[in-house]
Amino acid sequence: MRIEQELKLGFKDVLFRPKRSTLKSRSQVELTREFTFKHSGRQWSGTPVIAANMDSVGSFAMAKALSEHGVMTAIHKHYTVEDWAGFVKENDASVLNNSMVSTGTSDADFQKTKDIMALTDDLIFICVDIANGYSEHLVQYVEKVRAEFPDKVISAGNVVTGDMVEELILAGADIVKVGIGPGSVCTTRVKTGVGYPQLSAIIECADAAHGLGGRIIGDGGCSCAGDVSKAFGGGADFVMLGGMLAGHEESGGEVIEQDGKQFMKFYGMSSQSAMDKHSGGVAKYRAAEGKTVLLPYRGSVHTTISDILGGVRSTCTYVGAAKLRELTKRTTFIRVQEQENNVYGKE
């Protein structure tokens, strides 16, 4: 047993220090980023925010809506190949280039991914997604996927330390997904005692990835636009959002009415709700590691994503970053014990 004494930080532990700026308006901030990925050699241009591959967030409807903002969606893995065929038929490259095909690591998952990717050349992103990215099986699976799809952009995770980021990149991942337990409907840290404060995880993993020419996704832990900015400031190339994009018309799932008010169900992908729906219940050898909540129905996602991106633009003006890619270079975090004044409630 050993104890690491260095304090690790989450988003609530810091604020940006403001800096002099020559920007006159938020409209001058460029949020579009261009990436060339290490292994595939693919180029992508867009706003590097991703809707999470949860079946109450990462829907086909979400992908279509967010693509209008240049934002990506990791489509959840529970759509059938036939569902995908219909989606491909109905949408052009502007939507498909911003849609990630999510997969697990079983042989059936591999075959399904092959069938989906064969539908069109416009699908360029594959998201290999398991809860515990420290499995040797994940590394082997990434190698297998890279061998099968040498020209596709592969994301893999989830991990929270630089050593595994490096191993996954060397195995063939272009992007590594970072985050264990920070999500709003994730209870992994409570059920297992395992995790890593998300901001420190992003800072450390970004350093490891960028040293090898790889990229990272900061996955989870954001509850407001300021947290999204902090993730980018910490070095995340992409930021993945679940709860912030849940509860919308495009999120998938049914609208529930209680006492005259409308709600939508939102649940973690290791929750009992998810396992009841997709796996026939919680297996005897495991525990559910997610919660199920009812969120007030929020209407169209367009207003929410515009608000999030507006907040990120505002962050950039406060620290003097004319482009999103400059934000991490302009970032100085100060450690704090308070974030906001809650006299009249929390924002």
Swiss-Prot record:
Amino acids binding K(+): G181, G183
Enzyme class comes to oxidoreductase
Please name the catalytic residues of this protein.
C186
Record-level GO cellular component terms: cytosol; GMP reductase complex
**Signal peptide start-end:** none
Annotated NADP(+) binding lies at 108-131, 216-239
Top-level taxon of the source organism? Bacteria
Q: Which GO terms describe its molecular function?
A: GMP reductase activity; metal ion binding
Identify the SMART domains for this entry: IMPDH
Q: Which UniProt keywords apply?
A: Metal-binding, NADP, Oxidoreductase, Potassium
Its recorded reaction(s) are:
IMP + NH4(+) + NADP(+) = GMP + NADPH + 2 H(+)
PANTHER family given in the database record: GMP REDUCTASE
Q: What does this protein do?
A: Catalyzes the irreversible NADPH-dependent deamination of GMP to IMP. It functions in the conversion of nucleobase, nucleoside and nucleotide derivatives of G to A nucleotides, and in maintaining the intracellular balance of A and G nucleotides.
Query: Hey, which family's this protein in?
Result: Belongs to the IMPDH/GMPR family. GuaC type 1 subfamily.
Q: How does it assemble?
A: Homotetramer.
What NCBIfam families would the database entry show?
GMP_reduct_1, PRK05096.1
The protein depicted here goes by the name: GMP reductase
Species name for this entry? Aliivibrio salmonicida (strain LFI1238) (Vibrio salmonicida (strain LFI1238))
Q: Quote the gene name from the UniProt entry.
A: guaC
